């Protein structure tokens, strides 16, 4: 009886040791699979350069791992410009001719002279270029300008919020890492001067800032009477000086 109990204990101990050894040998493999399944992040950062009413919107995109295998890929940024700002399509055309940017406006009816309260959101496509100083980075810039805003009663500034853009990528071949980032497909021109339409992958990314904000100085309503009076006086003065110069130095023939 005692011998049988000892035998059963030995068998149970042997089974337990084997089970622990199997679990230990499988642990590194499982951990390795977990590491391989973790996707690196795409980091996007945008900021305003320059001061005053004419700024440059700089957009930088950094991939979480080397993109040496993604040299055949193109990056497209679809940005939505709020009504408080505008992009000059003629300025973009001039920059494209000098090969300084690859951006084109999607909005057809666009008035750069319209004030903020009569304007709508506009969309711009920007074909990003690889950053020469960072092998894993792309960058693009877009010149933007402030619109005229209604005067305020108290505060002399207004806040403009620039939302994060859509990030699109198109590759000539499939890469496993793209499955980590891609969310959906969007139809867009394959290149700036191409009429061919490609299916770009909408990429998931992490932004440094939730939203980019900028303060724009505006007039105050309490200054309306003063501004109108001074403007009228200057207009009358200049008109009078012009008429005096015409009568004094002009040559009239009947």
Curated annotation (Swiss-Prot):
**UniProt key word Glycoprotein:** yes
A single GO cellular-component term on record: endoplasmic reticulum membrane
Supply the InterPro entries for this chain.
Answer: PIG-X/PBN1, PIGX
The topology of this chain with respect to the membrane is: Single-pass type I membrane protein
Tell me, which GO biological process terms does this entry list?
Answer: GPI anchor biosynthetic process
- Write down the superkingdom of origin: Eukaryota
Q: Which pathway does UniProt place it in?
A: Glycolipid biosynthesis; glycosylphosphatidylinositol-anchor biosynthesis
Q: Please tell me whether the keyword GTP-binding is annotated for this protein.
A: no
Q: Which residues are glycosylated?
A: 211
Recorded hits in Pfam families, A to Z, give: PIG-X
Q: Which chain regions cross the lipid bilayer?
A: 227-247
Q: Which residues lie on this side of the membrane: Cytoplasmic?
A: 248-254
Q: Kindly state which keywords UniProt assigns to this record, in alphabetical order.
A: Endoplasmic reticulum, Glycoprotein, GPI-anchor biosynthesis, Membrane, Signal, Transmembrane, Transmembrane helix
**Physiological role:** Stabilizing subunit of the glycosylphosphatidylinositol-mannosyltransferase I complex which catalyzes the transfer of the first mannose, via an alpha-1,4 bond from a dolichol-phosphate-mannose (Dol-P-Man) to the glucosaminyl acyl phosphatidylinositol (GlcN-(acyl)PI) intermediate to generate alpha-D-Man-(1->4)-alpha-D-GlcN-(1->6)-(1-radyl,2-acyl-sn-glycero-3-phospho)-2-acyl-inositol and participates in the sixth step of the glycosylphosphatidylinositol-anchor biosynthesis. Probably acts by stabilizing the mannosyltransferase PIGM.
Family stated for the protein in its record: Belongs to the PIGX family.
* PANTHER family assigned to the protein according to its UniProt record, in alphabetical order: PHOSPHATIDYLINOSITOL-GLYCAN BIOSYNTHESIS CLASS X PROTEIN
Q: How does it assemble?
A: Part of the glycosylphosphatidylinositol-mannosyltransferase I complex that is composed of PIGM and PIGX. Interacts with PIGM; PIGX stabilizes PIGM.
Q: What is this protein called?
A: GPI alpha-1,4-mannosyltransferase I, stabilizing subunit
